[in-house]
Amino acid sequence: MSLIDQLNQLEQEALAALDHAADLTALAEWKSAYLGKQGALSRLSRGLGALPAEERPAAGARFNAARATLEQALERAEAQLKRAARQHAFEADQVDVTLPGRAPAVGRLHPTTQMLRTIYTILGEMGFQVWESPEVETDEFNFQLLNMPPDHPARDMWDTFYVETASGEPTLLLRTHTSPGQIYAMRANAPNPVRAILPGKCYRYEQVTARHEMQFFQVEGIAIGERISFADLKGTLVAFAERLYGKGVKTRFRPSYFPFTEPSVEFDIECFLCGGAGCRVCKHSGWLEILGAGMIHPTVLRNGGYDPEKVSGFAFGMGPERMAMLRYGIDDIRWFFSGDERFLQQF
C-alpha cells in the first residue's frame, strides 16, 4: 500500500473516531493520538524520506492536506462540544418561575432610634421642636456659657475628651452633654418664647459598665417664656413619663445640682426590672434616674439673649438608652452598641 493510500485510510479512521468523541477530554485524547508529536500522522510522515524524489512532492502535499483536514475537524468538534456544555449549564441554572419567591430580609430600627422617635412624638405634641447642634464643641459653649467659667469645680462632673488644636485656636472637645444646644436655640429665638428639644450623641471618658457608656445619646429640652414655673416643669415631665410608661408609673423628684439650672432636680422612675426591690441596674435603690432638670439659671438666659427679669424657663436632659432599658427590660446598656443581631432582632 502506497504512502498516499495509508494517509487516506488514516484520515478516514481519524474522522470516524472523532465522531465518537463525546466530551472535551475525549477530544484531547483524540488529538494526542492522531495529531500529537508521537501521533499516527507524525509516525506516518517519517516514510516521506524513503520515497523516490519524484513521488515526494505529491505525498508531502497529501500529508499537509490530511493534517489540515483533521485540525479543522477538531476545531469544529471542539466548538460544538463547548456550545453543548454552555447550553447544558444554562438549562441547569434556569429558574423555575412557578416557585414562590424569596422575600427580602426586613430590617429593624435600633431600639435607641425607636426611643428617640417616641420622644420626638410625645414632646412634639407638647409644642417642642427638634433642633440640632454640633458634636464637636468649643469650651465656651460646652462650659462657659452654661455658667461654668474656667477652673469652675463643676467641670469635674464631666470627664471630657479634648481635641488637639493649634496654638491660639479655641479649645475644642467632644461635647459632654447636649446642653450647649440650649445657647444655639436661645440665640436663634430670643426674645421670643421657645420650646425646643436637642437630640444627639455625647461623649465622656468613663468606665464602661452596665449603666454607663463612653458614647451615648441625650435629648436636651428647653422651654422659655413669661411666667414659666417649676410647676410647669413638673407637669411636663410627669405627663411625659405617663405617656411613655403608662398612667400607673411611679415617679419622684430629688434635689440635685447642675450649674446651668437653679433649682435643679433628678427625675426618677421606679425600676421596671425589679419592681422597686433593687437590682444591679438600679444599684439596688429601686429607682432609675432617666433625666436631670431644673429652672434655667439667669446667667444662662442672659448668655442666650434673654432678659431673666422678663422671662423664665426650664431645661431637662434625658438618656434615650436608659429609658429604652426601662421600656424593654434591658439590663445592660452595653447591648445597645454591641451590634449583636440576636439583640437587635428582638425590636
UniProtKB/Swiss-Prot annotation:
InterPro entries recorded:
aa-tRNA-synth_II, aa-tRNA-synth_II/BPL/LPL, Phe-tRNA-synth_IIc_asu, Phe-tRNA_ligase_II_N, Phe_tRNA_ligase_alpha1_bac, Phenylalanyl-tRNA_Synthase, tRNA-bd_arm
Task: State the organism of origin.
Answer: Roseiflexus castenholzii (strain DSM 13941 / HLO8)
Question: What's a BP term from Gene Ontology annotated to this protein?
Answer: phenylalanyl-tRNA aminoacylation
Which cell locations does it reside in?
Cytoplasm
Q: What class of enzyme is it?
A: ligase
Tree of life domain = Bacteria
What name does the UniProt record give this protein? Phenylalanine--tRNA ligase alpha subunit
Q: Which GO terms describe its cellular component?
A: cytoplasm
The cofactor named in the record is:
Mg(2+)
Q: What is the lineage of its organism?
A: Bacteria, Bacillati, Chloroflexota, Chloroflexia, Chloroflexales
